[in-house]
Amino acid sequence: MVTLSSPSPSLSCVENVTCKSSHVSRVLISGTDNINHGESSEAKILRDVHISERLLEDFTELARENTEKDLETCGTLAAFLERGIFYVTTLIIPKQESTSNSCQAMNEVEVFSIQNERELYPVGWIHTHPSQGCFMSSVDLHTHYSYQVMVPEAFAIVVAPTDSSKSYGIFKLTDPGGMEVLRGCSETGFHPHKEPEDGNPVYEHCSNVYKNSNLRFEIFDLR
């Protein structure tokens, strides 16, 4: 099933997201002191990423049935690159197997096909924690490593509707610290990770992601 977001997802309009009528705002998330400390790894210059203001709302609605059953839902975020900025225009929800604390994408060739046809970059992913807090589990970190090793700007959105202090977060692995930890870890399942040698945490909140009021996107629900 393909769902088109509103306003109209015409790519001719998407490419004009820098027009004067659009409103772009940095994503600000409260309660970040326990993750960001010391010198942010984003001292390394990263491209800005724009997401639609409707992305979180639309994904949360698509995940509602699973959330009510205490099952996770996941999706891939794909973007095009224009003038040094990534614009997320596509949300792909693959076939998947879920539990209350995990979500495994199936038939990922379908996801790759959509991305390749549209010449899009896999810049991140989004998933729910239906009954847990807003954080990145060890399994989430390994999943995200596979994105960030390809695209340094890759980010992970966690939607946690039952977390009263923070209903969502946008995260990335610290670089080089967190990336080195994950690169050298061969464990599977839920497990602790050592602290990076540079003194930073394994992951942190993103500061280069912005909500764009004029950015249109399409949703491919392949379930």
UniProtKB/Swiss-Prot annotation:
This is AMSH-like ubiquitin thioesterase 2. It holds the Pfam family JAB. Zn(2+) 1 binds at residues 127, 129, 140. GO terms for biological process: protein K48-linked deubiquitination; protein K63-linked deubiquitination; proteolysis. The keyword Zinc applies. The record marks 72 as: Indirect zinc-binding. Residues 49-177 form the MPN domain. Binds 2 Zn(2+) ions per subunit. It comes from the Eukaryota. Belongs to the peptidase M67C family. It is an enzyme of class 3 (hydrolase). Zn(2+) 2 binds at residues 142, 185, 191, 193. Its cofactor is Zn(2+). A motif (JAMM motif) lies at residues 127-140. Keywords: Hydrolase, Metal-binding, Metalloprotease, Protease, Ubl conjugation pathway, Zinc. Zinc metalloprotease that cleaves 'Lys-48'- and 'Lys-63'-linked polyubiquitin chains. Its EC number is 3.4.19.-. One of its GO terms (molecular function) is K63-linked deubiquitinase activity. The JAMM motif is essential for the protease activity.
